């Protein structure tokens, strides 16, 4: 057993090593973190609203991004909210490009959210298990794209090389 090497697993479909810091179990049991529901009474909500504001401010500072969101129920709804935010940040475009290598369950939630906001979800093909960057660049150049969604590692467990993708997006005014 001592001769075995511990390697990083990228099996795909969410089956990979997960690390949960020991503080998490104590934190998630606290009432203010137990739900993303915000009470309607202002005097009760102030603490909740304050820590959400602090979290969002810290996330924008850490990531260098202009916008951040909090209070998401799970990864799928958080991703769908990111699609809504990309659309809202764009003044003209209402299309979001999504790689075929994104988890189908996440894609299903995104499509549901997008449908009711009249956001067009357009898929970007994959080649050999990775996002087709040529097709992505071609679709971005149309100029009507609010954002691009990729997953890392992707649904197939592959760590894609996304170098240059952010530059492509920014050159075409997409998030």
Q: What annotation goes with each model-predicted range?
A:
Residues 1-54, 60:
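N-terminal entrance/gating region of PLP-dependent enzymes' catalytic architecture
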Residues 9-12, 61, 67-72, 98-99, ...:
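General beta-strand structural signal in soluble alpha/beta enzymes
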Residues 20, 74-79:
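Conserved redox-cofactor binding core of oxidoreductases
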Residues 19-20, 55, 106, 132:
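Alpha-helical structural motif
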Residues 15, 67, 160:
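Short, flexible micro-motifs
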Residues 55-69, 81-94:
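Phosphate-binding glycine-rich loop
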Residues 43-50, 70, 74, 153:
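Short, surface-exposed alpha-helical recognition segments that flank or form part
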């Amino acid at each position: 057993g001592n001769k075995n090497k511990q390697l990083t697993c990228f099996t795909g479909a969410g089956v990979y090593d997960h690390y949960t810091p020991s503080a998490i179990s104590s934190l998630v049991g606290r009432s203010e973190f137990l739900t993303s529901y915000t009470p309607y009474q202002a005097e009760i909500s102030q603490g909740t609203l304050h820590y959400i504001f602090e979290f969002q401010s810290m996330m924008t500072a850490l990531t260098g991004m202009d916008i951040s969101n909090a209070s998401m129920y799970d990864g799928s709804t958080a991703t769908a909210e990111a699609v809504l935010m990309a659309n809202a940040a764009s003044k003209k475009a209402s299309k979001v490009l999504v790689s075929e290598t994104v988890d189908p369950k996440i894609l299903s939630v995104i499509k549901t959210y997008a449908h009711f906001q009249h956001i067009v979800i357009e898929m970007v093909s994959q080649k050999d298990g990775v996002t087709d960057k040529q097709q992505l660049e071609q679709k971005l150049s149309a100029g009507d794209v609010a954002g691009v969604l990729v997953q890392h590692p992707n649904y197939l467990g592959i760590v894609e090389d996304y170098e240059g993708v952010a530059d492509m997006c920014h050159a075409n005014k997409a998030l």
